[in-house]
Amino acid sequence: MKAIILAGGESSRFGKAKAFAKIDNQYFYQKIIETLKSTNMFNRIIISTNSQLASQFEYEYVIIDDEHHQNKGPLTGIYSVMKQYMDEELFFIVSVDTPMITSKAVNGLYHFMVSNLIESRLDIVAFKEGEICIPTIGFYTLSTFPFIEKALNSNHLSLKHVFKQLSTDWLDVTEIDSPYYWYKNINFQHDLDSLKMQINE
């Protein structure tokens, strides 16, 4: 099983590439890699990013966005990695701006997926916060690839457009025994400042 860290966004609201923001004296991407490795679930953890940022990662497995679909958001990142690993059946997706994700969250979502997979024939299993879906923390089967490709080719670039066409299920973030901020994504500098305060409470 492969894990994909989506790190190709422009980060214009944050002011710099969020992958290289720091929490607990680690870059976001390094912290997420460490967490994913601790699960022992993945035979490879891949950073998906754009050509401008690729050389800045001190990491072996970096895939650059497909040249035909650059600057099209998270769908491009997922597509670009899946395209390189068409023999893989399942991918875990996480956005680089979710640095506090925990191994309990990854394991919890995986077990939720396995317990529902056969009965529901699921394509995507991800988290939700109440009624709000969080598709950038989830498991995607390879069966999603043609739908992602079609969406990119037709410039329907929202993940919502894709998962509406597929069999999906959602696990509420409150089901995970982790600090309440584990799934929070960082969009602005004040989000990071707030997160640091919450960690130190």
Swiss-Prot record:
InterPro entries: MobA-like_NTP_Trfase, Molybde_CF_guanTrfase, Nucleotide-diphossugar_trans. It catalyses: Mo-molybdopterin + GTP + H(+) = Mo-molybdopterin guanine dinucleotide + diphosphate. One of its GO terms (molecular function) is metal ion binding. Keywords: Cytoplasm, GTP-binding, Magnesium, Metal-binding, Molybdenum cofactor biosynthesis, Nucleotide-binding, Transferase. Its main location: cytoplasm. It holds the Pfam family NTP_transf_3. Its EC number is 2.7.7.77. Belongs to the MobA family. This is Probable molybdenum cofactor guanylyltransferase. It comes from Staphylococcus epidermidis (strain ATCC 35984 / DSM 28319 / BCRC 17069 / CCUG 31568 / BM 3577 / RP62A). The lineage of its organism: Bacteria, Bacillati, Bacillota, Bacilli, Bacillales.
